[in-house]
């Protein structure tokens, strides 16, 4: 599959690299066509790794990962182009670092509202980027969540997550449930501080 990964930071690099290892063709998108981080990444991937602007990547990808900083995600997706996202699944893994817990909408909801013809699926935003792409880094079973309005889109992402190694996924419901996972961030940050590592996750025992 041709997949766009928007964002050149640690998360974008981890997701894009995993997808290439799994055999997908991946274009890493950034604000400029000559982004140094994106260019350096392509040197590690062989022919399946490409780089371009946000818009280039959105045109290229049959599926789009939003791995940008949550505070700039809407601007990045706008640069990608609403027409280029139409009908496509947009996997939103971003968090706003300082979420407004009184806000009426999550970032996932804001993206869905701004791009109503895209199929937004919120997932992977409750773990660090190493665990996102390698859940076996932690022993035992642990859980990842899905939120989105389109059932077929969530089923497809569920299957993609299985190829990442995820065996326990919970579909929370429509995109409004992204508020729950985004609101987990303050607890996640407190746990990171207390444990001295971000390599942890939660297991929903049932």
Per-segment meaning from a language model:
Residues 33, 95-97, 125-128, 150, ...:
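Glycine-rich beta-alpha junction loops
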Residues 143-206:
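Active-site-lining helix/loop region of Rossmann-like oxidoreductase modules
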Residues 23, 60-62, 115-118:
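Short, well-ordered alpha-helix to beta-strand connector turns
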Residues 14, 18, 114, 160:
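Rossmann-fold NAD(P)-dependent oxidoreductase module
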Residues 1-44:
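NAD(P)+-binding Rossmann beta1-loop-alpha1 motif at the extreme N-terminus of oxidoreductases
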Residues 46-89, 93-98:
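Rossmann-like NAD(P)-binding element
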Residues 94-137:
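Rossmann-fold NAD(P)-binding glycine/threonine-rich loop
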Residues 51, 119-125, 169-172:
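General beta-strand structural signal in soluble alpha/beta enzymes
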């Amino acid at each position: 599959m041709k997949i766009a990964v928007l964002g050149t930071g640690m998360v974008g690099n981890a997701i894009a690299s995993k997808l290439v290892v799994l055999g997908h063709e991946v274009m890493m998108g950034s604000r400029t066509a000559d982004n140094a981080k994106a260019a350096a990444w392509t040197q590690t991937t062989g022919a399946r790794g490409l780089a371009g602007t946000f818009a280039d990547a959105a045109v290229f990808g049959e599926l789009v990962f939003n791995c940008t900083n949550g505070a700039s995600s809407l601007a990045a997706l706008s640069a990608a182009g609403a027409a280029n996202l139409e009908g496509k699944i947009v996997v939103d893994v971003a968090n706003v670092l300082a979420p407004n817990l009184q806000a009426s909408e999550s970032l996932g909801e804001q993206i869905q509202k701004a791009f109503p013809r895209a199929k937004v699926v919120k997932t992977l935003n409750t773990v660090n980027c190493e665990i996102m792409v390698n859940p076996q880094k932690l022993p035992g079973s642990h859980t990842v969540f899905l939120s989105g309005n389109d059932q077929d889109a969530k089923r497809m992402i569920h299957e993609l997550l299985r190829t990442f190694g995820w065996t326990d996924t919970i579909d929370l419901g429509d995109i409004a449930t992204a508020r729950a996972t985004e609101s987990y961030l303050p607890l996640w940050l407190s746990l990171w501080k207390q444990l001295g590592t971000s390599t942890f996750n939660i297991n929903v025992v049932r």
